[in-house]
Amino acid sequence: LYSGVGNTGHTYIPAMLQHSGLEVDMASTVVALSVLVEAPFIFYSYLFMDKISMKKLLYICLGIIFLQYSVYALDLGLISKIGMTLLSKHVTGMVLIMVTLKIVASLVDEKFLVTAIALVQTSRSLGTILIQNLAGHFLDNWGYEGMNLFLAAVICLVCLLALFLKLPERKGNQLFG
């Protein structure tokens, strides 16, 4: 579900920024710059990915995504939308990919790791199809604010479901170190 929200953002955020008054070229520039913001998180992932528990990392990312879509839903102005896009759009997506790798690696035997990751990616794609279709319905009927409120609500649901997620913490498993 969280991948569906993130991928829906990839689809609709540039159009939302344009709808909020930003020129198309500037909206594209904002999205391009948000990709560059994620680079330090990739290069320095070894500093935090193996030191923070999987559940904490998951909740941190989900909290940032919830904040992002809440700001979009509340329509606090173009500057706030640009700021949230720059600070969170790609960063949370990349960290969630790393968290997913860490979770799968901790739950599955190494010889089944590729198959398990393929299954995760398949379910992420199916979640994206579901969420994007629902988000499109909300956008058509209630505009960008309604769609973003729906996406924030989906993240709340994911947070509730994550409460029941049992994740082992493997000591000595330095996936990113």
Set out the residue ranges of the language-model regions.
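Structural signature of the two symmetry-related core transmembrane helices
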Residues: K56-V71
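A membrane-interface helix-boundary motif in multi-pass transporters
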Residues: H137-C156
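Loop-to-transmembrane helix entry/capping segments in MFS-fold secondary transporters
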Residues: V24-D25, V108-V120
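Helix-loop boundary and gating motifs at the non-cytosolic
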Residues: Y2-V30, I97
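Intracellular juxtamembrane helix-capping segments at the cytosolic ends
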Residues: V95-V108
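Helix-loop junctions at membrane interfaces in 12-TM secondary transporters
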Residues: A73-T85
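A late C-terminal transmembrane helix in Major Facilitator Superfamily
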Residues: V114-N141
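Helix-to-loop junctions at the C-terminal end of transmembrane segments
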Residues: F41-S53, L139-D140
